Swiss-Prot record:
Domain of life: Eukaryota
Taxonomic source organism: Rattus norvegicus (Rat)
Lipidated residues (GPI-anchor amidated glycine): G122
Name under which the protein is recorded: Shadow of prion protein
GO cellular component: cytosol; membrane; nucleolus; nucleus; plasma membrane; side of membrane; vesicle
Listed Gly residues bias regions: 26-43
Record flagged with keyword Membrane: yes
């Protein structure tokens, strides 16, 4: 997962976590008993209770927070180990896997164009502490990162 993808997922999940409606009340709250009328009163009513599912459950919020923290940790681990995603060479540029197919008269179907490795790896490590600091500051403000 590259920086852009990790950042987008972390921000998307943090937004979903922050914009979650907290007005849904769980458990036994609100008007009960005779305040509900004859059918919903405590006397003579069945104990079967139909409750609509909440819009977002607590487990979804926990999963979103965990995924955002995991994405931030993955990005930070990539920075710490120095492993980064390398940019692939474009048309007309010499890449790591150039061979006779890239030369004049070649058919241009070498591994550098069609291999999975060429599209998912790059040539150097990426050092951008600003994104890591932004994510850790955001997650720290949300109290999702605990020392």
């Amino acid at each position: 997962m590259n920086w852009t993808t990790a950042t987008c997922w972390a921000l998307l999940l943090a937004t979903a976590f922050l914009c979650d409606s907290c007005s849904a009340k769980g458990g036994r709250g609100g008007a009960r008993g005779s305040a509900r009328g004859v059918r919903g009163g405590a006397r003579g009513a069945s104990r079967v209770r139909v409750r609509p599912a909440p819009r977002y459950s607590s487990s979804l919020r926990v999963a979103a927070a965990g995924a955002a923290a995991g994405a931030a940790a993955g990005v930070a681990a990539g920075l710490a180990t120095g492993s980064g995603w390398r940019r692939t060479s474009g048309p007309g540029e010499l890449g790591l896997e150039d061979d006779e197919n890239g030369a004049m008269g070649g058919n241009g179907t070498d591994r550098g164009v069609y291999s999975y490795w060429a599209w998912t790896s790059g040539s150097g490590s990426v050092h951008s502490p600003r994104i890591c600091l932004l994510l850790s500051g955001t997650l720290g403000a949300l109290e999702l990162l605990r020392p």
